[in-house]
Regions:
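Active-site neighborhoods and metal-handling regions in enzymes and metal-associated proteins
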Residues: 1-175
Length: 175
């Protein structure tokens, strides 16, 4: 419903900005921005630490960013989407976190969400072949607790961790 989503603490994704929600010392927030230029979409998000953030939250944000950095190295012609998911899930699980399987990256172009679906859990050497000209997002959503989630019943958009644990996300559009 907005061109910018703000996902705070246990909001996994699609948090709707509100002037009623004031950031607090120690919060972590993901700001997810969609842009359209000449009919083409792009999508990106970044994490921000507000004030004095505890070491556990800081580590979650760092591990999530590091998993994306590793995944970006897997993006090359004739690679596989499964390689991207594998490197993310392996790294995240090594650090004791979970990564969402049911919500992931997506193709972008003339529409905001296009094929392919980019799962952030995968097996090396499997999945769609990466070919020149593909444009898609890599955006793992990493939870401090379990990967279970629920969608806000009122707005049918905002996604929360089921167990109330923190969640972090970094997103890049790659071409």
């Amino acid at each position: 419903p907005k061109s910018v989503c703000t996902s705070i603490n246990n909001v996994i994704c699609h948090g709707i900005p509100s002037e009623d929600e004031i950031l607090q010392d120690g919060d972590i927030i993901n700001v997810d921005v969609t842009t359209i230029l000449d009919g083409y979409y792009a999508d990106a998000s970044r994490m921000f630490l507000i004030g004095n953030v505890c070491d556990e939250a800081r580590k979650l944000v760092e591990v999530t960013k590091e998993s994306v950095d590793l995944a970006l190295k897997e993006v090359k012609p004739w690679g596989r989407l499964g390689d991207i998911g594998a490197v993310i899930s392996e790294y995240v699980h090594q650090h004791g976190y979970t990564v969402l399987r049911d919500i992931g990256g997506h193709g972008v172009g003339n529409d905001f969400h296009e094929d392919p679906y980019v799962c952030h859990i995968g097996k090396r050497g499997t999945g769609m072949l990466l070919v020149p000209g593909m444009v898609f997002t890599i955006e793992p959503m990493v939870n401090e607790g379990k990967e279970d989630f629920f969608v806000d019943e009122e707005n049918e958009w905002t996604v929360y961790t089921e167990d109330g644990s923190l969640s972090a996300q970094w997103e890049y559009t790659v071409a």
